[in-house]
Structures are given as structure tokens and as C-alpha cells.
């Protein structure tokens, strides 16, 4: 019996408390793409040909971040709504990896997390090519959600206005 009590006390003392992360309210809402900087050069660096770059650039994009429809605390839903394809990432938690279909119609391992209180990250690892890792950084700037991406030294910023 003493061993059991000692074991329980050890687990309680040694095990760090795991606290769920909460997405700051400033990231919640609906944001519609209004403009971008250097996006064509970024798409070239990613290997997209001219026709596909035009299709991607002409696609309207709306991003929605909200508390999860499941009602579970510290869980979220995110939607990418485009004129080409929509994706819905449901019931995820910050720092938790999940697998889902991305805008390129392939399966990705996706993790949303907070780099700091002002920066939300979204990391994608292609399931069929784990060397293809891409991280998007989101920050709020006034009425805008600014998404920054880089690939092989080429960076872009996309500005989504809060609706």
C-alpha cells in the first residue's frame, strides 16, 4: 500500500501539468483575401507553371477561424473557402497534429500552434512527401490577418480583411 501511495505522489509531483492552449480571440473570425505581395514569385519558387499560377492568383480566398462546432473547449475549426476548392479542418487543438486534405487535394499532416501571443502558425507536411514542409505565419495588423509564407528564400504576404 505504501508503494502505491508513493507511486501516486511521484506521478503527481513529477508529471508537469499539461495546460491546453487557447487561440487568442483576435484570430477568430472571417477574413477575405484583399491583396498580396510577391505571390507570383513565391508560386514560381514552389514550381507552379504560368497557367496554374494564374488560376491560383485569380481564386478568391476566405479564411474562417472559429471555436469548434463540437463545443469542446480550446478546440477550433478552420475553413479555406476558394472559388476552386474548399477545405474544412475541424475540431483541432493548438499544438496537435492531424491529417486532412489540403487545397492541393493531397493528404497533409497539419499543425496549428502559437509561435508567440501575436503569431499563429499553420504547418503542413505532405503525407506522400515528408520532405515537403511548409509553414504559414498569421499575424493581425489592424483589420487584416496577414499570412506570410516563404519557400527557398522567396517570401510573400497575403492580406485578408476581417469581415
From Swiss-Prot:
The keyword Transport applies. PROSITE patterns: FABP. Gene3D superfamilies: 2.40.128.20. Keywords: Lipid-binding, Signal, Transport. InterPro entries: Calycin (IPR012674), Fatty_acid-bd (IPR000463), Lbp1-4 (IPR040094). One of its GO terms (molecular function) is lipid binding. Abundant in the fluid surrounding the developing embryo of Ascaris suum. Residues 1-23 form the signal peptide. Belongs to the calycin superfamily. Fatty-acid binding protein (FABP) family. May play a role in sequestering potentially toxic fatty acids and their peroxidation products, or it may be involved in the maintenance of the impermeable lipid layer of the eggshell. Forms a beta-barrel structure that accommodates hydrophobic ligands in its interior. This is Fatty acid-binding protein homolog.
